Amino acid sequence: GQIMYNAVKDFKKPVVALVHNAGSAAFLAIAGVKEIVASGELSRLGSIGALVSLDRKFIQTYKDRFDEIYSDLSSDKNAGIRSYIETGDSSLIKQSLNETVLAFQSIVTAHRDVKKKEETLRGGMFQAKDAKSRGLVDIIGTEDLAIKRLKTYFK
């Protein structure tokens, strides 16, 4: 999402995004476009958040099979995952996720006129009409409409 967002941001011409489903990284990728067109009323957008999935069985197998030895000069390396593996404490991982979400929200609100911010930025997905009322979509329509909207920027 971040790489595509940067590419759109640096692109010298307006970009109109036509999407059916755009959640999480896909929404980040289109956050800076000139207009977002939802392809129909069943389109869903949002999921402005972050998560990490950790396989407990894999972690237990990893703990049983491997020893990790860190340099005395690298005591903070992988601190979040190390804390989780060693003690089950996910607080450092959550802290990192929270920082990521705040940055994600900042990007979205810098480019979109987000309504109902507290609700909209909690990670939910919204169908097209609801997403439009929240400022996540500009218009609901077809590919032809998206092309027409794009052409208006080149007159």
Predicted feature descriptions by range:
Residues 83, 121, 136:
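Short, flexible active-site loop motifs that bind/organize anionic cofactors or intermediates
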Residues 25-26, 46-49, 123, 135, ...:
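Glycine-centered flexibility sites
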Residues 17-23, 120-124:
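Glycine-rich beta-to-alpha transition loops that act as phosphate-gripper elements at the mouths
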Residues 73-77, 121-124, 144-148:
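Short linear loop/turn motifs
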Residues 85-88, 126, 141:
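Short coil/turn linker and secondary-structure boundary residues
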Residues 1-13, 22-111, 152-155:
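Small-residue-centered hinge/linker elements
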Residues 94-118, 128-155:
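C-terminal long alpha-helix characteristic of the crotonase
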